[in-house]
Design a protein with these regions (language model features):
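Catalytic palm subdomain of template-directed nucleic-acid polymerases
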Residues: 122-144, 219-222, 234
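Residues that scaffold, gate, or flank divalent-cation-dependent active/transport sites
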Residues: 1-118, 122, 255-257
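Acidic, metal-coordinating catalytic segment for phosphate/diphosphate chemistry
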Residues: 18, 348-465
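Long, highly charged, low-complexity intrinsically disordered interaction regions
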Residues: 143-202
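Short, conserved phosphate-binding/catalytic loop or strand-edge motifs used
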Residues: 117-124, 161-166, 232-233
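DNA-contacting surface of Y-family translesion DNA polymerases
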Residues: 8, 206, 216-388, 407
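A glycine-rich phosphate-binding loop feature that marks nucleotide/adenosyl-phosphate handling sites
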Residues: 161-164, 255-258, 314-326, 388-400, ...
Length: 465
């Protein structure tokens, strides 16, 4: 099989860099965080400029952590460090991301680019090395220099013989190497480099697709490095342990430990999921009562259904996840009333066990009436009315295009004419929203106490547009 060359390119502190450039500041020298200070100081920073990161502030710190760290820094400085807190502008970041994607298209076909996130791409550069008569490092620098000249934003890149090695070269090797004068870091590795340089690297969570849960289970078995996974995988007893502990993911874990990755760019482009879903999630700015949480779920469902209609899709199931606030178990009075199981949340804090449930609609549908009715019944069935809610997730499952949905025999219990009228109303609502904005037409539920629909309509991905 032909050896291939892959690039992974990550725009450096992308959101922060956009804010710096738009203010005429040097992204590498300015002190800036992207965070919505209007919420609370507990809000997570979406980005931190490299100059602030150099003081030990993490890229996903909470705003109060930034405030505390800067106070500590200023105690030992004659001139106080001053920084900018920039509110998120998601629409602007997406605009710049599209501009940068157009730069990639000047050199690379869309068939050989996989957009991994708003600030990160994978590129199969194999055929372009011959086309441009250059090596992978030269091509990578050409792309990054064009991005820098056009947008003022720099990048970090990894080059590898497969997608995994390109990603690891970028995430670990490049980010621990010295930058050039423009802050650019590029590293290149093959399988043997990977084993030599990274088999003993810690923490293991630095590696792509290894989260804290996986690392914890590995450490309980005495495994702390990728090299140890590779060596243990040669023994039948250990191989059995991996598959028993991680299921089908064990195969990928072992492959990655050896620096192997069978997936190619062509595989990514050919992939079509067997089933699909649409989902919406909200982390609430403060703990919500059950009654207020019910309003939020109603709003989320109605927006998801409009998304179905706009995309000409149908769903047949809804799944609801309710995550409760930690104060339900830390507040003495509330703790007395709660007798249910306690688990640890994402941050390791004690909280009531989340509620989870699903409802089938009995048909493929995009009816707001049918789906909202099922959602409210589900919420009432699984939500604990005495607990405060902090996070909600709603998922519409088994989504298919309307033209691929199997026909359904009409029955005496469904008002097909009413569903048709509702569909025309949905189409009208979408047309008004397209012309005049998402808040041009609202429902009564959007004005109830605790509702966030109007605010969410002005956001992209849960952040200010």
């Amino acid at each position: 099989m032909e050896n291939r060359t892959y690039l992974a390119i990550d725009l450096k502190s992308f959101y922060a860099s956009v804010e710096c450039v738009d203010r005429g500041l040097d992204p590498l020298q300015a002190y800036l965080v992207v965070a919505d200070a209007s919420r609370t100081e507990k809000t997570i920073c979406l980005a931190v400029s490299p100059a602030l990161k150099a003081f030990g502030i993490g890229g996903r710190a909470r705003l109060f952590e930034v405030v505390q760290r800067v106070k500590e820094i200023n105690r030992g400085r004659r001139e106080p460090l001053e920084y900018i807190t920039a509110p998120p502008r998601m629409a602007r970041y997406m605009e710049v991301s599209r501009q940068i994607y157009d730069i990639y298209l000047k050199y690379i076909s869309a068939d050989d680019i996989h957009v991994y996130s708003v600030d990160e791409v994978f590129i199969d550069a194999t055929d372009y090395l011959r086309l441009y008569r250059c090596d992978a490092h030269t091509l990578t620098m050409r792309l990054i220099r064009d991005i820098l000249a056009t947008t003022g934003i720099t990048a970090t890149a990894g080059i590898g013989t497969n997608l995994y090695l390109a990603k690891v070269a970028m995430d670990i090797v490049a980010k621990h190497s010295a930058p050039d004068k423009d802050g650019v870091r590029v590293s290149q590795i093959d399988e043997m480099d990977y084993r030599r340089l990274l088999w003993d690297h810690t923490p293991i969570t630095d590696f792509w697709r290894i989260g804290h849960g996986t690392a914890r289970r590995l450490e309980q078995a005495g495994i702390r490095t990728m090299g140890e996974i590779a060596r243990c995988s040669l023994e039948p007893a250990w191989e059995e342990f991996f598959y028993k502990s991680f299921g089908v993911s064990a195969e990928l874990l072992i492959d990655h430990a050896w620096g192997w990755e069978p997936c190619t760019m062509a595989d990514i482009k050919r992939y079509r999921p067997a089933s699909s879903s649409l989902s919406s999630g909200q982390v609430l700015a403060e703990p919500y009562s059950c009654a207020k949480g019910r309003i939020i779920v109603r709003e989320m469902v109605e927006l998801l259904v409009l998304d179905l209609v706009e995309k000409r899709l149908l769903a047949d199931q809804i799944v609801l996840d309710i995550h409760y606030d930690t104060t339900n178990v830390t507040d003495p009075e509330r703790r007395k009333r709660y007798k249910g199981p306690v688990v640890k949340d994402w941050y390791g804090r004690p909280a009531p066990k989340p509620a989870h449930g699903s409802r089938n609609f009995g048909r493929k549908t995009s009816s707001t009436t049918l789906i909202a009715e099922a959602a409210m019944e589900l919420f009432d069935a699984v939500a604990d009315k005495d607990l405060l809610i902090r996070r909600l997730n709603v998922t519409l499952c088994n989504v298919v295009p309307e033209d691929l949905a199997e026909g359904r025999q009409m029955d005496l219990f469904t008002d097909e004419a009413a569903l048709e009228r509702e569909r025309r109303q949905q189409e009208t609502i979408l047309e008004i929203r397209r012309k005049f904005g998402k808040n041009a037409i609202l429902k009564g539920v959007n004005y109830e106490e605790g509702a966030r629909g109007r605010e969410r309509n002005a956001e992209v991905g849960g952040h200010r547009a």
